[in-house]
């Protein structure tokens, strides 16, 4: 019995092969299959944001001016979240709320869901683009894995958190000052800075910045001289076989500074990947917890003692009072639809005031 082994080849290309050839062709800007998701979604997300910040008011959703047309600048303009009464509606243009009326759709906050959902899929498309290109040039996919950190933060903050609350209203609006408002809201209503997941996120992001600065400086300090251009970007050939900098010298330097140092480039660079990505993922997990209204650390014994002893105050009890102040002063401004009125006597006053 004879078995013939060989590679099967099709006589003519089908539609998939034709599309694959065109999408993955070597060109100045790579398209790829991931581009079918990335480019349209990124275009719509950015276009929706520019449209909203330029023309669309937030008067009907937040009682605010939020566009350049109304007098805002780059820092104060925003695409605002829909009203709380609309809960978690997708706010489709052709849905029951807007009924195909584009002006009404903008007034209701439809641009926010439009930007948020297209933005999320655009970020996912960008990660898939990194996977696709890495596979094409036979790289490992760690760039795409690293980009999962920002995606996790975006999805948790803009989508999962409001899904756990009463509506999209409690998500951040897309604007600089709007994000600042959201940060104050997170602190006042969730005591976010005392949340261990926030602490891990801060450690990851700031630790990554420190590692990046140290690594860049160390490489610059230990470059091998090679010709006249040793201190310029033309000093080395991108296809060179030899090292660009001296790992041995760098190891000796940091061993003297700290007593310990990385002795392996692979471990060093994996650590530089691990620190920020883990920090971002921990932050995202913390925000998912806040969506379920999980609490941060509570030091109840200090609160009880502060309530009983007029002379006792800690930075923790002071922060708790500040959070109460944020809630009392902010809720009425931030949620005008609730018609909240707080008498002067219920506003928090600490022992030190």
From Swiss-Prot:
UniProt entry tagged with the keyword Chloroplast: yes
Cofactor note: The D1/D2 heterodimer binds P680, chlorophylls that are the primary electron donor of PSII, and subsequent electron acceptors. It shares a non-heme iron and each subunit binds pheophytin, quinone, additional chlorophylls, carotenoids and lipids. There is also a Cl(-1) ion associated with D1 and D2, which is required for oxygen evolution. The PSII complex binds additional chlorophylls, carotenoids and specific lipids.
Assigned keywords, A-Z: Acetylation, Chlorophyll, Chloroplast, Chromophore, Electron transport, Iron, Magnesium, Membrane, Metal-binding, Oxidoreductase, Phosphoprotein, Photosynthesis, Photosystem II, Plastid, Thylakoid, Transmembrane, Transmembrane helix, Transport
Domain of life, per lineage: Eukaryota
Membrane topology: Multi-pass membrane protein
Chief location of this protein within or outside the cell: plastid
GO cellular component: chloroplast thylakoid membrane; photosystem II
Annotated transmembrane regions: 41-61, 125-141, 153-166, 208-228, 279-295
Positions bearing Phosphothreonine: 2
InterPro entries (UniProt xref): D1/D2, Photo_II_D1/D2_sf, Photo_RC_L/M, Photo_RC_L/M_CS, PSII_PsbD/D2
SUPFAM superfamilies: Bacterial photosystem II reaction centre, L and M subunits (SSF81483)
Gene Ontology molecular functions: chlorophyll binding; electron transporter, transferring electrons within the cyclic electron transport pathway of photosynthesis activity; iron ion binding; oxygen evolving activity
A Pfam match: Photo_RC
This protein's name: Photosystem II D2 protein
Lineage summary: Eukaryota, Viridiplantae, Streptophyta, Embryophyta, Tracheophyta
